[in-house]
Structures are given as C-alpha cells and as structure tokens.
C-alpha cells in the first residue's frame, strides 16, 4: 500500500476528530501515515508558527521515503505568508528524482502554483485529510478519482459539460480562483501559454466569481489559454437582490467576451465529490454533444 506524509502549511485543524478519522480510515485501508503531529499544532488561526509551517514544506526536500504521497491536512489561510521563504530551488531539485506526489487544494493552490512557476513541478489538486478522507463517509467518486490519477500514467475524466464543441490540448493548470488572483504579479504565478485553465472556489457570491474571472481576463491570462474549465463554486447562492443573476449569468457574460471555449460542470473543488487533477500535466480536452472528456498524461505516479 502507500505511505502518506502529512503537512499543515495553512489553517489550524479545528476538526480534530475528522483528522483522526481520516488517519484511521487510511491506516485501516493498509496505508502508513507519517508526521501526524502536525494536526494538533496551533498558533492563532494557523496550524503552527510560520517557522513550523515553513519547515513542513522545506523539509520535503530532505524526505527520503520512496513512493510517498504528501497530503495537506486542510486549507484555510496561511500559505501566502510562507511564499517568500520557501526554498523553491531545493524542492524543485528534490522533485527531479523520485518525485513526491503532493496533493491538496484551496489555500494550498498558492504552493502548487509556486512549484509550477519556479520549476515546472507537477502536483495534484485533489482531496485533503480533513474535508475528504476524514469526512463522515469517504465519497466513492472522490476516492476512485484520487487513485485513478496517482496510479495511472494516462487517464481520462468524463462528464456532461456545458459549452461549445471543441477539441484542444495544452498544459493543465489552475486550482482555487481566489488564490490564483492573489498571485497575479508575483513570482509564484505560473506563466502558462496555450494551457487549459481549471478553476474552482467556495463561499464566493456569483458577482465576486465574475469579478475575479474578469481580473484574469483583463490581466491577459484568460485570452492566452486554449480553454477554461470551471469546477464547483460551493456556497455561491444568489439572493433576492440579484433578481435572477447567478453563476449561469457569469458564464454567459464571460463567453460573450472570450474567443476560447469555456466548459462548465466538472466535479472539481470543495464539494465531497471531486476529481483529482495533476496541475502541470498535459491534457487533451474534447467536448461534444455526447459529453466531455479530459485525458491527462505526463504526471508522476506511484510505483506499483
């Protein structure tokens, strides 16, 4: 089975019971879980001091265990504080041989983008310990797609997407929309041309989602892509004031401005049902009336 190494570079794990349940679930399945002490750390709202959380990341360069999955405990906020002090060069060098399979999402997007920007390091945007593996019930779809991505050099995700018929390919990248916005103009924002940009978010009203997407558009980032895929935007329920304005309104407005396909409906993000995507891998997108396919390759996988 697999070895999981936990890291907690972001928010304090307020759901300790869920973290313990996630660890138990993984060990019951025959996996080994290391570095479990990080789940109890706390400094204000963070999972430890800056020094402790930074060491979670920088110590990965010295990790010698083979075939290791690095799993973020949870998101929240905190990764942005660490970006300037991460030893990117050491992490990039470490990933050039026997790469760690680094997985997380939400606030962790900042770390993932930094690794991609600094050294084309591929990481996995997917489930985390508390919200997913520690849920009351582990979602079967999420579990299946996690192992699908980590065990197969080439794999395909299928869904019923909304958007124009298209077939294109490029570097798959993205993650949490708000975190990408926070990286614009910094050394940790990947400079991807002709890519396939995939985005998700949580607790953002539709107008805020639109505003962030427009910022990516006006910054020239969206027009430089081959396609955009939108995942889930949890907690984005409109109110009476919106008078019918919703996420579909956002999508329609963006499509009226973009000359590239925008495909929606992917189960990707903060919901219990989510795929796992290797950010920085090669992807082929095919959208027809029959459905949508995303075939991904070129990412590191577990050695079976």
Curated annotation (Swiss-Prot):
Localization of this protein: Cytoplasm
Record's Gene Ontology CC terms? Answer: cytoplasm
| Enzymatic reactions | N-acetyl-D-glucosaminyl-N-acetylmuramoyl-L-alanyl-meso-2,6-diaminoheptanedioyl-D-alanine + H2O = N-acetyl-D-glucosaminyl-N-acetylmuramoyl-L-alanyl-meso-2,6-diaminoheptanedioate + D-alanine
Q: What domain of life is recorded for the organism?
A: Bacteria
| One GO BP | regulation of cell shape
Keywords, in A-Z order: Carboxypeptidase, Cell shape, Cell wall biogenesis/degradation, Cytoplasm, Hydrolase, Peptidoglycan synthesis, Protease, Serine protease
Question: What's the Enzyme Commission number for this chain?
Answer: 3.4.17.13
- GO MF annotations for this entry? muramoyltetrapeptide carboxypeptidase activity; serine-type peptidase activity
InterPro entries on file: Carboxypeptidase_A_C_sf, Class_I_gatase-like, LdcA_N, Peptidase_S66_N, Peptidase_S66C, S66_fam
PANTHER family named among the record's database cross-references: MURAMOYLTETRAPEPTIDE CARBOXYPEPTIDASE (PTHR30237), MUREIN TETRAPEPTIDE CARBOXYPEPTIDASE (PTHR30237:SF2)
**What is the documented function of this protein?**
Releases the terminal D-alanine residue from the cytoplasmic tetrapeptide recycling product L-Ala-gamma-D-Glu-meso-Dap-D-Ala. Can also cleave D-Ala from murein derivatives containing the tetrapeptide, i.e. MurNAc-tetrapeptide, UDP-MurNAc-tetrapeptide, GlcNAc-MurNAc-tetrapeptide, and GlcNAc-anhMurNAc-tetrapeptide. Does not act on murein sacculi or cross-linked muropeptides. The tripeptides produced by the LcdA reaction can then be reused as peptidoglycan building blocks; LcdA is thereby involved in murein recycling.
NCBIfam families named among the record's database cross-references = PRK11253.1
The name this protein goes by in its record: Murein tetrapeptide carboxypeptidase
| Gene name, Swiss-Prot/TrEMBL | ldcA
């Amino acid at each position: 089975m697999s070895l999981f190494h936990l890291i907690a570079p972001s928010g304090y794990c307020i759901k300790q019971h869920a973290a313990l349940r996630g660890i138990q679930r993984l060990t019951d399945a025959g996996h080994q879980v290391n570095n479990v002490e990080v789940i109890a750390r706390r400094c204000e709202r963070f999972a430890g001091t800056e020094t402790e959380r930074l060491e979670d990341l920088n110590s990965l360069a010295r990790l010698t265990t083979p075939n290791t999955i690095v799993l973020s405990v949870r998101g929240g906020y905190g990764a942005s504080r660490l970006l300037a002090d991460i030893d990117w060069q050491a992490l990039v060098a470490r990933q050039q041989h026997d790469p760690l399979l680094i997985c997380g999402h939400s606030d962790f997007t900042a770390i993932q983008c930094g690794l991609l920007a600094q050294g084309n390091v591929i990481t996995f945007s997917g489930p985390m310990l508390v919200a997913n593996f520690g849920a009351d019930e582990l979602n079967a779809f999420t579990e299946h797609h996690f192992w699908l991505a980590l065990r197969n050099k080439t794999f395909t995700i299928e869904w019923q997407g909304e958007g124009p018929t298209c077939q294109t390919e490029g570097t798959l990248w993205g993650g949490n929309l708000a975190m990408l916005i926070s990286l614009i103009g910094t050394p940790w924002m990947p400079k991807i041309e002709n890519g396939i940009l995939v985005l998700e978010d949580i607790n953002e009203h539709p107008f805020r989602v639109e505003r962030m997407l427009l910022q990516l558009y006006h910054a020239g980032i969206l027009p430089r892509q081959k396609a955009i895929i939108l995942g889930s935007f949890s907690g984005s329920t409109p109110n009476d004031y919106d008078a019918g304005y919703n996420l579909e309104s956002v999508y329609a407005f963006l499509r009226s401005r973009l000359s590239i396909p925008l495909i929606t409906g992917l189960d990707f993000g903060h919901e219990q049902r989510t795929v796992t995507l290797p950010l920085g891998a090669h992807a082929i997108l095919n959208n027809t009336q029959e459905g949508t396919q995303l075939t991904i390759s070129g990412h590191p996988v577990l050695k079976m």
